[in-house]
Amino acid sequence: MSLYRAAWICPIAQPPIGDGWFAVANQRISRVGAPGEPAPGPATDLGRVAVLPGLVNAHTHLELSWLRGQVAPAASFTDWIKQLFVTRGGRRERADDPTVTNAARVAAREARDFGTAGIGDISNSLATVECIRAAGLRGIVFHELLGFNLSNGQSVEDTRPYRATAAALGGDAVRVSVAPHAPYSVSPEMFRAIRDEINASAVRITSVHVGESDGEVEFLHDGSGPWPALLQWVGAAREGWTPPGLGPVEYLDSLGMLDERTLVVHGVQLADASLRRLASIGATLVTCPRSNQWVGVGAPPVERFYAAGVKVAVGTDSLTSVEDLNLFAELKAMRALAPSVPARRLLESATRVGAEALGVGGDLGTIEAGKRAELIAVGLPDDVVDVEEHLVSRVRTQDVQWVTV
């Protein structure tokens, strides 16, 4: 057993412990000292740092990292989508494309360097499973499907062997699931098929983009807004499709798509009633504030998320819509949008809530006996009074390092 002490230990599951200590055995936390309790032996002094669990990035698209810096911020979501399509030039991400895989490996390592231990990654190619595992991260790669015809070559059944192969590469660290893209890009039949596939799987966790833009809300309500023209522009017009006349959450709920193992990503445009419904279901809402503003959908109503009682996790989204994969930058953005939310709740979102949503809560998310010793140390200036507030608003990249145990 090895002992470590630091100016602050932030277990997340309890208030910060000043002049605290913890013990590690076999790469797992074996004990956390109670406030005021002396260490039972000589301890390695980590210095004036706050030790906290590695962060959890609950939503990103690592396979798009090859497009980093090529898609500019836009005034509207449809403008950003058009930029993305033009920049890609018809190129699709593939597992045998070294441009894609090399960029994904770099991005996964970058996420790790920023203090990330767990990740929820969206992938069309499943190229990122090996990249994530090689970077020392844990989590889920969601195989994203979209289409309005189950026989279009992207069907759930036809792609099952690809997921099985990828899951073997991921081992225990990186599991593979299946996920629908969004309400405007997936047919009701495919949603139901994906739900059946998830229910029959060992992972049973999925993710879906919901309520990201106001155009999505209009499209589902009565078929209006910018989406019909955009879908026609990309060659995916919804011929013969009847709008459900429902909000995004209500529509997915009617299809049986939402449960306590569903990650609902973005939620920028969701009404209070929809947020309360997510809370009652037990779904986790993943907010990506920097990306939302980059793609022109506006600022997410972070305070309303918490007020509605929704479980809130944090994601960066892809490097096509954000400068980096730094979750401390996301926390700073969340703090600006939600000044009344207690700092610990924001920290929980970037650690415990994300870990539990991705099914890795037994290993990550808090500093408690039995958890993996995946810990980061954040350097603290002398003037810090409220350590949790500092962590959500003032952390610099150079302040973050991994604790070597």
Stretch-by-stretch model annotation:
Residues 1-40:
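N-terminal metal-binding scaffold of metallo-dependent hydrolase/deaminase domains
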Residues 1, 40, 128-134, 158-284, ...:
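Histidine/acidic residue-rich metal-binding segments in metalloenzymes
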Residues 61, 124-125, 144-148, 179-183, ...:
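Active-site beta-loop-alpha junctions enriched in small/polar residues
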Residues 50, 68-136, 158-171:
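Alpha-helical scaffold segments that flank or form the walls of functional sites
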Residues 36-52:
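Active-site metal-binding motif and surrounding structural segment of the metallo-beta-lactamase
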Residues 54-65, 205-214:
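Histidine-centered catalytic micro-motifs
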Residues 66-102, 140-148, 213-261, 334-341:
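Active-site gating loops and adjacent loop-to-helix segments of metal-dependent hydrolytic enzymes
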Residues 356, 372-405:
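C-terminal cap of metal-dependent C-N hydrolases
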